[in-house]
Amino acid sequence: TYVSTEALKDGGSWQQVARKENCRGWAVHTQNNIFGYTDWLINRPANAWYCTHLWQHYAYTLDKEYLRDTAWPVMKVTCQYWFDRLKENTEGRLVAPNEWSPEHGPWEDGVAYAQQLVYALFEETLAAAGVLAVDDAFVSELKEKFSRLDNGLHIGSWGQIKEWTIQEDKQGDHQRHLSHLMALYPCDQISYLKDKRYAEAAKVALDSRGDGATGWSRAWKVACWARLWDGERAY
């Protein structure tokens, strides 16, 4: 895939973004293409988001050769990027510093968008290590950092999944982005099958966004309502 090609290209533009921050691995901005182009505003957690697609390809195909040769090398160096970037907060949890909820609100440490995506990256990379029977120094470090990683799931004052750590979410804010619900969709940390509290909090947050939006945002909301087992609202 072009993601593996560009992420692993020595001295490529995606690696250069990471090197500017003194990090291993790679990172991208908001706009990217198959030729390695990346521009506009920084979107660091997008590298973790890309990796979810690599893992999902394996999960649906069970192609172990693909996992070993294509997905694993990218997932590994992406984790190393976050090893270098994460910081410890006052509670001893690892958080992504100076991140944002795309097109919405302030820049803060530990924003839900970043935390949920990095959590998915670490969790799925550990799953990949299990499939491939990899147990080395990298996996040991990954396990240690994953155990201290903030998962980005915090319930706010009006029962919602919080979008930021410090900034207070505004009820009835109809922002089209649902970046604080990455753990609901496309990731799967939030589910009625896993923890009803978080599923209910995601429902409160999603309902607060309203149903009106641009086309892509409506499609996203359909997927989120489906994940919450509400076929009528999705329809």
What are these regions (language model features)?
Residues 1-23:
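Carboxylate/His-rich catalytic cores and anion/metal-binding grooves
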Residues 5-12, 81-90, 105-106, 152-157, ...:
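Secretory-pathway/luminal and periplasmic proteins that interact with or process carbohydrate-rich
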Residues 15-38, 93-113, 161-173, 228-229:
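Carbohydrate-binding/catalytic loop surfaces
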Residues 67-76, 93-99, 140, 201:
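Beta-strand segments within the central parallel beta-sheet cores of soluble alpha/beta enzyme folds
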Residues 77-131:
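Acidic/histidine-rich catalytic neighborhood
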Residues 3, 75-82, 228:
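Alpha-helical transition-metal enzyme core signature, strongest for iron centers
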Residues 1-8, 32-35, 39-64, 69, ...:
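Active-site core of glycosidic bond-cleaving carbohydrate-active enzymes
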